[in-house]
Amino acid sequence: MPGVRSLLLALAGVSLAPAVLAADASTDSSDVHALKTDTFKDFIKEHDLVLAEFYAPWCGHCKALAPEYEKAATELKSKNIQLAKVDCTEEADLCQEYGVEGYPTLKVFRGLDSHKPYNGARKSPAITSYMIKQSLPSVSVVTAENFEEVKSLDKVVVVAFIGEDDKETNKTYTALADSMRDDVLFAGTSSAELAKKEGVSLPAVVLYKEFDDRKDVYDGKFEAEALKAFIKSSSTPLVGEVGPETYSGYMSAGIPLAYIFADTAEEREQYASDFKDLAKKLKGKINFATIDSKAFGAHAANLNLIPEKFPAFAIQDTVSNKKYPFDQEKKLTKQDITKFVEGVIAGDIAPSVKSEAVPETNDGPVTVIVAHTYEEIVMNKDKDVLVEFYAPWCGHCKALAPKYDQLGSLYKDNKDFASKVTIAKVDATANDIPDEIQGFPTIKLFPADDKDKPVEYTGSRTIEDLANFVRDNGKHKVDAYDEKKVEKDGSDVTGKPKDAEAPPKPSDAPESEEKADKEHEEL
């Protein structure tokens, strides 16, 4: 495990790097450093840890992020963690160098040669928590003197009690910490005395948390996968709260999520209390969480509930994306909810499927998919299937439409090509789909005989590039592009990277991708 000194320095916010002048010449009081091409690389070199935002002034999501990013910068400044920003409309080459494809893009830098994307919630507490974890060693060494302080560094802290000579167990724990350091703060000690004080003996793992029973002791075998499952389960409250900071965690948990929609904090507190015993009984099988229906009521439509009719309850299978809405004419009683949840888990209750009507004819160049035909068309094992997931209000989708039709014609008009490749599209706001869609348009290729490994398209949206993508990634290697058969192709129809976060939320449909007047917030 790393030395104690590195942890103490990080806790104290002491800088190990030389002091540098602010990279921007602005005279405002912002704690976010505005970087340009000629200052970016020096700034990254001179700081151990930097979170950089690549943005565009016209981007609506960037504007929403700005105050949260500023709060996080101020909070992290005392810990010598720097937050910076780059305007990609002015520094296009720099943004291209770092693979920026959408706005905002956030990347964590540890020097110029080590950077990775930040994919967490775009809220100050989430950014702050994440960056503090990044500033510490993957496993922080604790002693009797700093133990209480380390336990309170984050909402969840995992501490291992392992003897120094137990090399194999130390190796397993360190590898686990490396793989989960983005989500959880890990610490460790070899002190048998400290272990005894905490009621355990070497080797042991204890998870400390700010909620429920405050701590959980792991009692299984010291194996990575079992430990990982324990940490994921124990770090989730019995009845939590769905919001921007927690949503992605629930979605990646690998088990269903039961939503409890209610308008007031008092109602949500009462429901959390009512269903706590059920949540405890089913822990590890399903997560329970309340959700503020005044702030996030639009999300109810994604679960096939009627928006604005609250309180409400629904279950979402986070793996298959199947939805199970509870009858909104009924009250949320312990008895009825228990029966409903157990029925869903047992497979006795069928999922609700939102689908447009199946088209009477489907003879156009692009095959139209609805939820009821998704399996039949996309999962056809004999064909390479390219699918555009779109939203009717999406400007980039509208711009792509004529080119996508021309692309479809290249295959549809050739009998041999048509037998091997399908070019298709689905309105992801009007149909339940099993795929996780983060922005519009999203284009994926489902190769023949390899449907569980779809390939997402991230290139420029020209007919030639799309056709070549199908050729290069499809099983049949169909080379359909013929410039004589298409109108002037031109360049990428977007003209600029897409505003990357436009999740499929029907009732949130904005008038444009850059600006949206929405009654509800986004998760």
Swiss-Prot record:
Active site per the UniProt annotation: 59, 62
Disulfide-bond pairs as recorded: 59-62, 394-397
Signal peptide: 1-22
Alphabetized CDD domains for the sequence: PDI_a_family, PDI_a_PDI_a'_C, PDI_b'_family, PDI_b_family
PROSITE patterns: ER_TARGET (PS00014), THIOREDOXIN_1 (PS00194), THIOREDOXIN_2 (PS51352)
Extent of Basic and acidic residues compositional bias: 478-502, 512-523
Protein name listed in UniProt: Protein disulfide-isomerase
